[in-house]
Each structure stands twice: as structure tokens, then as C-alpha cells.
Amino acid sequence: MEKTFLMIKPDGVGRGLIGEIVKRIENKGIKVVGAKLMTVSEDLAKTHYGEHSEKPFFGELVEFITSGPVFAMVLEGDNVVEIGRTLVGKTNPAESAPGTIRGDFGMTVGKNIIHGSDSVASADKEIALWFKEEEILSYDLVTSAWVY
């Protein structure tokens, strides 16, 4: 079964949105198989956002993601990367549809509540970066028969 990585950023955690966001994920039928509330080290932030290291906003991005706790998650389900991206919405909250996490809660491109892997390859890389293998669980949902 496919896995993806989602992270509620410091603005989402600070606004008390963890429960609402997890509720939306679970209501969709997606299984949370790993989760942790944590502070992000500068090294982890720089590695995670390494593809943006030459961009002018890189320093602000690292500063923001290390400014408060994040809620990191591993999600599992059929086609979960694409479904996760749909739930998250577009990077710019102003362009995100109502009903998406960013459309409903995001304020700016820089403070857009949540990160979601954009491909299966990115998900695999991000999960390995943020989670140890033993932090990812395997279990059955009683609703699996109706969802899958």
C-alpha cells in the first residue's frame, strides 16, 4: 500500500489545527501509520528543503519551519500521495479551493499550514528522513472493507 508524508507546520500547530486536519485525513479513509509532535533542527530543515537552497526564500523557510513545533505524519492508502495533495490544496492558499486544508486555513504562501509529498519518490525520501522504520506501524482499520 502506498505511503506519503504530511507535516503540519508551526502555523498550523500554533493555531490548534492538528485535530481538525487529522480528522479530515481520517474521514477520507486514509490511515495514519506514523505521527509525532516535534521541533525541527536546522540541519533537518535544511536537508528537507535542500532543493530550495539556492532560492532567495530558503533562509526564511528554514527559520519558519524551526520556529515552533510541527506535527509530522506518515499516511497510508491507495493512491495516498495524490489524495493527500488534493486534501492539502495548492501551495498558495489564495489559489486553493475551499474545502482544502490550505484553502480553509492557509494565510500566505510562506505560512500555508501544511506540507505534503508531491510524488511517491519524494514521499519515500521524506519518510526516511523524518521517521525511523520502527516509528511506522502496520494495523488494520475496521472500515477497510468499505474504503478499499
Swiss-Prot record:
Domain of life, per lineage: Bacteria
Provide the top EC class. transferase
Q: Which keywords belong to this entry? A: ATP-binding, Cytoplasm, Kinase, Magnesium, Metal-binding, Nucleotide metabolism, Nucleotide-binding, Phosphoprotein, Transferase
- CDD domains this protein is in? NDPk_I
Q: Which GO terms describe its molecular function?
A: ATP binding; metal ion binding; nucleoside diphosphate kinase activity
Required cofactors, per record? Mg(2+)
| SMART domains for the chain | NDK (SM00562)
Localization annotation:
Cytoplasm
Positions of the catalytic residues:
H115 (pros-phosphohistidine intermediate)
Q: Which GO terms describe its biological process?
A: CTP biosynthetic process; GTP biosynthetic process; UTP biosynthetic process
Q: Tell me, in a sentence or two, what this protein's role is.
A: Major role in the synthesis of nucleoside triphosphates other than ATP. The ATP gamma phosphate is transferred to the NDP beta phosphate via a ping-pong mechanism, using a phosphorylated active-site intermediate.
How does the annotation summarize its subunit structure? Homotetramer.
The name under which this protein is listed is: Nucleoside diphosphate kinase
Query: In which organism is this protein found?
Result: Macrococcus caseolyticus (strain JCSC5402)
Lineage runs: Bacteria, Bacillati, Bacillota, Bacilli, Bacillales
